[in-house]
Amino acid sequence: MLLNIKKYNKYNNKIETMTLSAGNVTRMVASYSYNDISRLLSIKRSGNVLRGYDFAYDGLNRLEESTYAEGAGMSQNKNRYSENILSYSQNGSIERLQRYGKKNNGAFGLIDDLTYSYNGNQIKAISDKAGSLLYDGSFDFKDGANADVEYFYDANGALVKDLNKGISNIEYDILGNLKCITFSNGFKTKYIYDAAGYKLRTTHESAVTNTTDYIGNFIFEDGKLDKYLFGGGYCSFDNNQNPTFHYYEKDHLGSVRMVVNENGTIEPSHTFGVVGYVKEFDSYFNEVVSCPVFGKNNTDLEEKITIVEQ
């Protein structure tokens, strides 16, 4: 059984604690603290390890620092996953961003040192002085280009080319739905929708062509039933079409933090960075595991080809 208990401040209705339990065992307790004008100052999460962030803001109430730490006194492994916004543009857009995490040698340190340039409010280019991580499963920014203009848009403001991700062209249908992504290596991802704009099929054309079909709440991979989606999670099917149920436990933002299968086994837990990216996937057995279907705020995490907003 899954249980999510939230406690709110009776004066300002801000969340104070959230307790996630599965199989009658408490798996996570998150506590939130605020300053006198209700700005979030810290989030601390218990589980295998107590971990959390402390936040600092500038005079315009914009986030400047998010300092990560672990342990009862929040003094261990300090800055392992910290994020710092060093400057904003006059329009309020991020100009300099630093992220910390696991480096290629296994140590923790600076993994992203990003500088953003804009044309109005549209990102024109991003450079990374920290370089790219090489290990599988890394979530740093991949600086795949070194040009004055790396992002291109159409007249409607939709992205049509991304040099950093090797995307040479993005096509949209007349309703503005994503139709085809073409990569510089010739690979393509194509999408088909019904008249109402609901996605019916995704086709990944690479060395091998794979299809994903969506029929109501059913998902088929290469013609075989793979998942059935329902409000609190999904049901997966193995090669013999035997079902296994998986249940979501979400945080106060609606992001999936815990997945529990029908046997009460904890599946991957998700840890999101402060500036909108996944910083790690972990399980309660400290194993590296494959990510599930849905990510932050229930958006798709496409495992074959992914476009991530920075």
Task: Annotate each language-model stretch with its function.
Residues 23, 47-49, 101-103:
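Short glycine/acidic-enriched loop and turn motifs that connect beta-strands
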Residues 189, 225-227:
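Short, isolated positions in well-ordered beta-strands
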Residues 21, 32, 110-153:
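Extracellular/periplasmic ectodomains of large secreted or surface enzymes and adhesion receptors
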Residues 72-76, 104-106, 133-142, 291-293:
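Intrinsically disordered, low-complexity Ser/Thr- and acidic-rich flexible linkers and loops
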Residues 1, 7, 16-17, 31-33, ...:
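Residue-level markers of secondary-structure register and packing in elongated scaffolds
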Residues 1-3, 7-9, 86-124, 214-223:
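Structured, non-catalytic alpha/beta "coupling" segments that mediate domain-domain communication
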Residues 25-27, 143-146, 240-243:
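Active-site-adjacent structural elements in folded domains
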